[in-house]
Amino acid sequence: MENISDLWNKALAEIEKKISKPSFETWLKSTTAHSLKGDILIITVPNEFTKDWLESRYTRLIEQTLYDITGEELKIKCTIPNHQTTEEFDLKPTSKPRKHDDEQTEFPQSMLNPKYTFDTFVIGSGNRFAHAASLAVAEAPAKAYNPLFIYGGVGLGKTHLMHAIGHYVLEHNPSAKVVYLSSEKFTNEFINAIRDNRPDDFRNKYRNVDVLLIDDIQFLAGKEQTQEEFFHTFNTLHEESKQIVISSDRPPKEIPTLEDRLRSRFEWGLITDITPPDLETRIAILRKKAKAEGFDIPNEVMLYIANQIDSNIRELEGALIRVVAYSSLINKEINADLAAEALKDIIPSSKPKVITIQDIQRVVGEHFNVKLEDFKAKKRTKSVAFPRQIAMYLSRELTDCSLPKIGEEFGGRDHTTVIHAHEKISALIQTDVQLQKQLKEIMEKLK
């Protein structure tokens, strides 16, 4: 085995990809490899609180990561400098270190995270459809949607849903062969099988399962041989009515250098996306996390965190954990001020303001003395129609809203009306100095 410091650094690099930045920096960044005794890797941590937290919440992730890197079943223990020496540990190996055989066809349920179930998944507007589709697949594998393709940004719940499907299937059919793995692990195992001249063992392993859950499929891009292998694996499973669930950070058509025949197969079933959670969902996520971990968090702190962290669930939960850890370490009660202090390193001092269509209507209405309801009315008088066109133009320029959504906010107007307004104002700006001045004033008020 390689030098344990190099091994631990590799493990940290992989773990950093899988958890939120605040969680990584709070619990793992300051850790180092101490020693290796038998099949137990001893990690040095800064204090007792970190030791308890790592051992209770990250053991499974760390040990799985070490296995992915080494192929050996290593256990971890934590030690605190000048607090406990390695000799004081009970270091009897829990099992003899051994390499996993790639041809192994039994897939331990430990590959599934026990915390990722449908019961622990918080449903919101951004994930409702993906949740419903995942539940339908779990209830009737290969009969509802096959394949199910879930895409969305990092930390939004794709992996949670995949694990939840696996748990549900096993709960209702304990003898089912359910496999969860990343496309990177699929690639590495395939390469090892080719190297060791055991391609048939690899094929038998993944073509004889009931449910295949494969995460981050976008990493197959550019890997021609692996794509070829996965293509045939996909075909075999699909023809035998076995369920396939795939996740990605983007839809199939946007994955570069993905073979067309794979892309088309990904589109055979149902494609659903997950978008970032809205404020209400973020608060619900924090409440559920706090309850699960036994944290007593005031509502004002929940609201503060939810308002500050709007990127993804992983960052959101990581921020909550950071606040709790900070409170424990300095022995102070959790409140909004403490939360602000704990999160000052990960929250920008001045977040850019998110401008909404309602903001635009309000400011444009004030500038031109137009009532808000007039923007949605059928009035076509110039005193109303022109400000409405300006508001539509700004909505197109300053928000991420679609044309139909903008039209809906202006009294249910057709998207072609929005296009016409945008084109008209865009043309006028080129020559109308007065309009340029008005738009500048409006935008300054908005920002």
Swiss-Prot record:
**MF annotations from Gene Ontology:** ATP binding; ATP hydrolysis activity; DNA replication origin binding; lipid binding
Could you tell me which residues belong to the region Domain I, interacts with DnaA modulators?
1-72
One biological process GO term for this chain? Answer: DNA replication initiation
Return the annotated region ranges for Domain IV, binds dsDNA: 328-447
Q: Where does ATP bind?
A: G155, G157, K158, T159
One GO CC term, this protein: cytoplasm
Domain comment (free text): Domain I is involved in oligomerization and binding regulators, domain II is flexibile and of varying length in different bacteria, domain III forms the AAA+ region, while domain IV binds dsDNA.
**Protein name in UniProt:** Chromosomal replication initiator protein DnaA
Q: Which organism is it from?
A: Anoxybacillus flavithermus (strain DSM 21510 / WK1)
Q: Please state the gene responsible for encoding this protein.
A: dnaA
